[in-house]
């Protein structure tokens, strides 16, 4: 029973992103070859995140890992491991973009509906199916973002769309902080400073890219 309880979050995470990728494949008007390329890139990045979460879990519990490695592997990952995984994965993604292995704008345009649908499915599964975990506030926020995305994604320039979604998500999360004790993303409690940092870094990257294109 304990083993099943530990496998449930992994299964829900995998099922949610599988649903997000399937939704992207069905609804995208890209060619099959481009869809395949984007899906391979997204799966690679998601695998990186999962691997780095496990590495982060080991690093944040290094003393216990030295004493009893199996105990750490059975121990649930915490927010620090999640932060570390996002940081390292972001750096690797940035390097791949700089080296020309990934085209940033098309990749993000493909990844946004995947992450939104995956987030929606994750919260839905916990709230409706498992009836444990998940928060109605974040579920509503993701639902609104998903609706907003599909209303305006063909009407706005890509980078303006990225900024709008980032602003709405960040503002929505801070509103949730004011009415509930914590906010979770894929089961990990995220602190306000992480939201600010995530928002700031992404806004700077988007605006710098716009400025460079404008100068060129």
Sequence positions of predicted segments:
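Hydrophobic, membrane-interfacing alpha helices
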Residues: 1-216
């Amino acid at each position: 029973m304990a083993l099943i309880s530990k496998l449930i979050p992994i299964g829900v995470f995998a099922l949610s992103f599988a649903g997000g990728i399937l939704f992207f494949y069905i609804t995208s008007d890209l060619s099959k070859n481009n869809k395949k390329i984007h899906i391979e890139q997204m799966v690679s990045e998601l695998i990186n995140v999962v691997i780095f979460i496990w590495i982060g879990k080991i690093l944040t519990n290094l003393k216990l890992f030295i004493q009893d490695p199996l105990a750490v592997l059975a121990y649930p990952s915490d927010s620090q491991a999640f932060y570390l995984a996002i940081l390292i994965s972001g750096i690797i993604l940035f390097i791949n973009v700089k080296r020309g292995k990934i085209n940033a704008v098309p990749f993000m345009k493909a990844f946004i509906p995947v992450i939104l649908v995956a987030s929606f499915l994750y919260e839905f599964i916990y709230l409706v199916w498992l009836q444990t975990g998940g928060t109605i506030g974040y579920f509503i926020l993701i639902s609104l973002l998903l609706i907003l995305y599909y209303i305006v994604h063909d009407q706005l320039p890509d980078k303006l769309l990225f900024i709008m979604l980032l602003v709405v998500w960040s503002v929505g999360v801070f509103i949730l902080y004011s009415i509930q004790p914590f906010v979770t993303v894929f089961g990990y409690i995220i602190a306000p400073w992480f939201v600010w940092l995530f928002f700031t870094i992404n806004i700077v990257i988007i605006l710098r890219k716009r400025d460079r294109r404008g100068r060129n």
